[in-house]
Amino acid sequence: MKITLLGAGAWGTALSIAFSGKHDLTLWSREVDVADDLRKTRENHRFFPGYKLPESVAVSTDFEVAVAGAELLVVATPIAGLRPTVERLQALGCKLPVLWVCKGFEAGSGKLPHQVVAEVLGKEALCGALSGPSFAEEVAAGQPTAVSLATNDPAFAREAARQLHTTRLRIYANDDLVGVEVGGAVKNVLAIATGVCDGLGLGLNSRAALMTRGLAEIARLGLALGAERQTFMGLAGMGDLILTCTGDLSRNRRVGLALAQNKSLPQILEELGHVAEGVYTAREVDRLAARLGVEMPISAAVAAVLDGRLTAAQAVEQLMARDPKEELA
């Protein structure tokens, strides 16, 4: 299959490596210097150092040329880049199926990725999300990984999963696109909370409680948006939550660890040097939960800490001071 990956960041590079043995690939880069580096050294020193891009992967900075001839497009930008990318596809009259790997709610609109794509390309456009417990570094290194592929057409999900599946990247088809996207978005917020918990030295009991109650928050929001409950017990729910909350490669977890040290958010993001989607998603989740009347106290506490309304320690005190509840109510 001819696949074009749009975006030469960590995920675009990692998936180019992962899919290279099975497909005819083109990696499109917006940054000319990144493309030049990839062509000359076969390494993305700016965004993803330490991993070699196979010679078989073509690198392009010409958007129209990169898209031409492809059978499948994979948008590998942060969510902030999703709309501009699909708008360029729409301008070309592109009718190709589109997948994305970004996770979150669009800043300002609060839309999930599939809503953004449908708004730009039309509801009839074949599209879907590749999501689950996966760090780009481990995917590029060929470590065994399993993810979900959810689309707006079950037959397309099954066929795309079959085509993209490799011996190192196991892909499960899923027909709950909303659930997969909500799981991938909100877990980033909860990873910040877990980082705060660990950074304050609150212990493993606290971490386990936070993750479990956080999963309940994901499910409540997802159900309010029309998702299926069982999705949150799978790879894009519990699986991604566990990885992002406990893995040291998690940018969102590292944000939480730094917040526990009372570092300012601008300083944290500057030191991180990469996008941490949970920082932006927290505010959208907080607004969406309020609008839908969904109780999400952990996510709300994260938003309050990020906005400077609470310190990390105050947020913990506030959560623990809440009235007793029935666990499964």
Swiss-Prot record:
**Domain of life assignment:** Bacteria
Q: Which GO terms describe its molecular function?
A: glycerol-3-phosphate dehydrogenase [NAD(P)+] activity; NAD binding
| Keywords tagged on the record | Cytoplasm, Lipid biosynthesis, Lipid metabolism, NAD, NADP, Nucleotide-binding, Oxidoreductase, Phospholipid biosynthesis, Phospholipid metabolism
Question: Which InterPro entries does this chain map to?
Answer: 6-PGluconate_DH-like_C_sf, 6PGD_dom2, G3P_DH_NAD-dep, G3P_DH_NAD-dep_C, G3P_DH_NAD-dep_N, NAD(P)-bd_dom_sf
EC category name: oxidoreductase
The UniProt entry's GO CC annotations, sorted and at most eight, read: cytosol
Q: Where in the cell is it found?
A: Cytoplasm
EC identifiers of the protein = 1.1.1.94
- What is the catalytic activity of this protein? sn-glycerol 3-phosphate + NAD(+) = dihydroxyacetone phosphate + NADH + H(+); sn-glycerol 3-phosphate + NADP(+) = dihydroxyacetone phosphate + NADPH + H(+)
Q: In which pathway does it act?
A: Membrane lipid metabolism; glycerophospholipid metabolism
Residues annotated for NADPH binding in this entry:
11, 30, 103, 136, 251, 275, 277
Q: Which residues form a coiled coil?
A: none
Question: Where, by residue number, does sn-glycerol 3-phosphate bind?
Answer: 103, 132, 134, 187, 240, 250-252
A biological process (GO) annotation for this entry? Answer: glycerophospholipid metabolic process
Enzyme active site: 187 (proton acceptor)
Function of the protein: Catalyzes the reduction of the glycolytic intermediate dihydroxyacetone phosphate (DHAP) to sn-glycerol 3-phosphate (G3P), the key precursor for phospholipid synthesis.
Q: Which family does the entry's similarity section mention?
A: Belongs to the NAD-dependent glycerol-3-phosphate dehydrogenase family.
Q: What is this protein called?
A: Glycerol-3-phosphate dehydrogenase [NAD(P)+]
Q: Which organism is it from?
A: Dechloromonas aromatica (strain RCB)
Q: Which gene encodes it?
A: gpsA
